């Protein structure tokens, strides 16, 4: 029988973390709650009698956090059993080895034990956010976006520095509770608080310095950004959605006024300056999948629809290129599903100037892991009603657009949840990009928390790379994020709206994270491996010593 105490504490921590992450009750989440959400879990680990209890309680914790914070996955085209159910069960088993690792570190004393807890937690969040099953949601940095000074360390450590610091703070609180319960020596707990306090102070001071020395943008890019608030997957509304996007674009170009900053974000930010009347626009930006059918193969459709104002005719009147989401047929690909989820830069004459195909796709939604296996295809068809998926794009692409303010601007276009992946965005940015423009379709989620969670996950990319991030979505959260992670302008959620914004473009900076990428993870893995070897050697020596002692005792008895 499994001990119920660690399971109850795991469930309590899961609920607390789900509330600390942006949710339907507190749209911004709670950074304070995030600094204490893991305390019940940690105390439960300390009170657990066996490794299997710790492992199972951690698996339960991960599964519950996923189910509670990403419950909106159930709305993905009616595939709730597949997208939410299968992933929740999968994460339970995926987390079990890390539960065993947590059980092993409980043998240490307070300061070392707490640091080891934070180290293993960091490795877990990296594993969860990497590879074929990558899904970087439900992580502790999602609770910290309001700590504007602390999160600036992301340009050195990436988001992984926060994956270490936040569990460390939780461990401090938990160790203090454990001290009062067990009446142990207070010196180790004091040392732990001193270490954690120093780390937080140093990181906050660094953050204050980085914000104060941000510098001025080298130019601005006038973007007409359109939020259609329409579901692009609804093929019956294809013509209506296209008409809406065209109308919103023309409204933005005609009025050229910027929206007020929504009151939802709690920080007081400066709204971007808007373009003056009839000022030239450098580029029009629509959202992911705005062109439901592949543009190149369906030009005849876009020449005829919408009937009142065909898309091709509208394009010729723009006077600026259009950045838009559309499926892309991958040339030379003869396999099933040879289409990529793509972003295309269309010139007013209808020519495709540049295109980028999405490389990182949502597991169990945009692609089926191990989908090349016939048995997996049959299972997916039976459970979800589909067995084919998108094909990854050929690789990073750098876009160029002329700027009315002078020269041109280079930018990269991570698609949808690609802006949640630090290494991928760094690979796109280090080609020479001065700006990240993300095109997203989150309308299917039908929840405000899903929109805000995506925004929170993505804002760390702006800090890591010290670049402006523009998120153009079809329902929210459409937002411009500065290199310090602050909101410069935003549209209200689930409203059809548009505006022309002057987006600041900063000089290209190669941050330490951009150069070294996930060095924190490498360091954590080396420490974890070295400590594992040390513990194994120590255990073997201890067993050998015990065996020799027992043998000598037996010999002595015979004598």
Curated annotation (Swiss-Prot):
Its main location: membrane. Pathway: Protein modification; lipoprotein biosynthesis (N-acyl transfer). The active site is at residues 288, 358, 416. InterPro entries: Apolipo_AcylTrfase, C-N_Hydrolase, C-N_Hydrolase_sf, LNT_N. PROSITE patterns: CN_HYDROLASE. It is an enzyme of class 2 (transferase). It is a multi-pass membrane protein. NCBIfam families: lnt. This is Apolipoprotein N-acyltransferase 2. It comes from Treponema pallidum (strain Nichols).
């Amino acid at each position: 029988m499994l001990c119920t105490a660690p399971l109850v504490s795991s469930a309590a921590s899961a609920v607390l973390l789900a509330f600390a992450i942006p949710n339907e009750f507190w749209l911004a989440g709670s950074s304070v709650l995030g600094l204490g959400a893991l305390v019940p879990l940690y105390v439960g680990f300390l009170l657990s009698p066996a490794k299997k209890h710790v492992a199972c309680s951690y698996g339960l914790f991960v599964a519950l956090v996923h189910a509670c914070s990403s419950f909106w996955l159930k709305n993905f085209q009616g595939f709730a059993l597949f997208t939410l159910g299968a992933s929740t069960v999968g994460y339970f088993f995926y987390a079990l080895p890390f539960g065993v690792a947590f059980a092993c570190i409980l043998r240490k004393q307070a300061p070392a034990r707490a640091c080891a807890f934070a180290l293993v937690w960091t490795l877990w969040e990296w594993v969860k956010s990497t590879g074929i099953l990558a899904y970087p949601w439900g992580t502790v940095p999602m609770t910290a976006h309001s700590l504007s000074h602390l999160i600036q360390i992301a340009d050195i450590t990436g988001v992984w520095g926060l994956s270490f610091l936040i569990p460390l703070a939780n461990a401090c609180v938990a160790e203090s509770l454990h001290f009062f319960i067990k009446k142990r020596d207070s010196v180790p707990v004091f040392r732990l608080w001193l270490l954690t306090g120093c780390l937080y102070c140093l990181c906050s001071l660094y953050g204050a310095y980085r914000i104060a020395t941000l510098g001025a943008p080298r130019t601005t890019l006038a973007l007409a950004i359109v939020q259609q608030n329409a579901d692009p997957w609804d093929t019956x509304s294809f013509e209506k959605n296209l008409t809406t996007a065209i109308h919103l674009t023309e409204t933005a170009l005609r009025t050229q006024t910027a929206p007020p900053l929504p009151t939802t974000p709690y920080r007081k930010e400066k709204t971007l300056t808007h373009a003056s009347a009839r000022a030239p626009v450098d580029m029009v930006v629509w959202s992911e999948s705005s062109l439901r059918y592949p543009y190149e193969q369906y030009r005849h459709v876009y020449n005829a629809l919408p009937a009142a104002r065909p898309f091709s005719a509208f394009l010729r009147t723009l006077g600026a290129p259009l950045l838009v989401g559309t499926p892309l047929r991958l040339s030379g690909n003869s396999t099933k599903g040879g289409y990529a989820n793509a972003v295309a830069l269309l010139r007013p004459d209808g020519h495709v100037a540049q295109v980028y195909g999405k490389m990182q796709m949502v597991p169990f939604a945009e692609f089926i892991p191990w989908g090349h296996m016939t048995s997996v295809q049959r299972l997916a068809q039976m459970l979800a009603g589909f067995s084919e998926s998108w094909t990854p794009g050929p690789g990073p692409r750098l876009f160029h657009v002329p700027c009315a303010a002078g020269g041109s601007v280079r930018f990269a276009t991570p698609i949808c949840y690609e802006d949640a992946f630090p290494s991928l965005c760094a690979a796109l940015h280090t080609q020479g990009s001065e700006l990240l423009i993300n095109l997203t379709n989150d309308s299917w989620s039908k929840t405000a928390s899903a929109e805000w969670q995506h925004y929170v996950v993505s804002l760390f990319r702006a800090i890591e790379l010290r670049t402006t991030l523009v998120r153009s979505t079809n329902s929210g959260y459409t937002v411009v994020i500065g290199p310090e992670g602050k909101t410069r302008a935003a549209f209200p959620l689930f409203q059809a709206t548009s505006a022309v914004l002057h987006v600041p473009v900063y000089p290209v900076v190669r941050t330490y994270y951009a150069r070294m990428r996930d060095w924190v993870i490498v360091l954590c893995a080396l420490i974890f491996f070295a400590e594992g070897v040390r513990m194994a050697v120590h255990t073997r020596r201890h067993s050998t010593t015990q065996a020799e002692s027992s043998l000598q005792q037996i010999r002595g008895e015979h004598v």
